[in-house]
Amino acid sequence: MTNIRKNHPLIKIMNSSFIDLPAPSNISSWWNFGSLLGACLALQIITGLFLAMHYTADTTTAFSSVTHICRDVNYGWVIRYLHANGASMFFLCLFIHVGRGLYYGSFVLSETWNIGIILLFTVMATAFMGYVLPWGQMSFWGATVITNLLSAIPYIGTNLVEWIWGGFSVDKATLTRFFAFHFILPFIITALVMVHLLFLHETGSNNPLGIPSNPDKIPFHPYYTIKDLLGLLLLILPLMTLVFFSPDLLGDPDNYTPANPLSTPPHIKPEWYFLFAYAILRSIPNKLGGVLALILSILILAIIPLLQTAKQQSMMFRPLSQCLFWILVADLYTLTWIGGQPVEHPFITIGQTASILYFTLILIAMPTMGLIENKMLKW
């Protein structure tokens, strides 16, 4: 058995990636979220495949095909709600995974970090297109509003939007192409995940201390496989609670009304995991400025390795930087809440303040605090 595991051309790749992989002996539960993201991706692909068997990407039948899945297909409602709430769990794990990378300085592994940012953008694009497919009111108007943002691009904006729409408004052509992209992107994400892991295994994993872990490593199996299984169990628990007890908790009631181009919902908003970026977009009165701020709110992650001024990689022994990190987390909570509120006083002011704070913390406060801590440690 050992010979097959170590000599077979395919199995030995699996062996060196998940069984005999030397892993740092001190990585905490914050490192579980990578494997949980893999589990979420697998769940989304499997449930999505079964949903695609019954879904029709046509404006006249899309809404009723989703209703048909829930009412007539055996356990169709379970598959549908596992897919919808699985996306929420996916993003929850994704945000924690990125947060852990920021806190413990994993961004110094630049190739892994940059592929991670590309993955984040791809997953966000996939989730956005998936939200359009049920063809409810919020699906239609969300698609209209978000795709329309591209019209802010000078010269080519209007042509670009009409090219994406496949006409002069969000219609059948838009729905069909969104379904096609929503189906293919998870497989592209899977390929990117493999590249992400390839780069990670080139350098080895970071650890909570932010120091080289070469002197003290343990095999991935059985230690971290058991640990990841426990994490998976703890993820399944809230997911199943959501699916079976309140499947529509994170959804929008407007999406149970079929799409109607002649009736605008009183408050157009995306799913909860996009609300922080949506709040930043809305906080700037200028359309192009808002779109740039929206993109930069995610793209800013790419320049974080350049902003690292502290001599210590991890924040574990930097209490002042820890304070700023948790202020950033609180700020993102605030932006998420603001994104779901109507555009009126005092929400506009709170949103603008939180948006300024978000960029200030990352671009100015954290690098400055790194320098201050170096001085305090006489480095």
From Swiss-Prot:
Keyword terms of this UniProt record: Electron transport, Heme, Iron, Membrane, Metal-binding, Mitochondrion, Mitochondrion inner membrane, Respiratory chain, Transmembrane, Transmembrane helix, Transport, Ubiquinone
Residue spans crossing the bilayer: 33-53, 77-98, 113-133, 178-198, 226-246, 288-308, 320-340, 347-367
Known cofactor(s): heme b
Residues engaged in binding heme b b566: H97, H196
Membrane topology: Multi-pass membrane protein
Pfam families (alphabetical): Cytochrom_B_C, Cytochrome_B
Gene3D superfamilies: Cytochrome Bc1 Complex, Chain C (1.20.810.10)
Keyword Nucleotide-binding in record: no
Further details from the record: Heme 1 (or BL or b562) is low-potential and absorbs at about 562 nm, and heme 2 (or BH or b566) is high-potential and absorbs at about 566 nm.
Name assigned to this protein: Cytochrome b
Organism: Propithecus diadema diadema
Organism classification: Eukaryota, Metazoa, Chordata, Craniata, Vertebrata
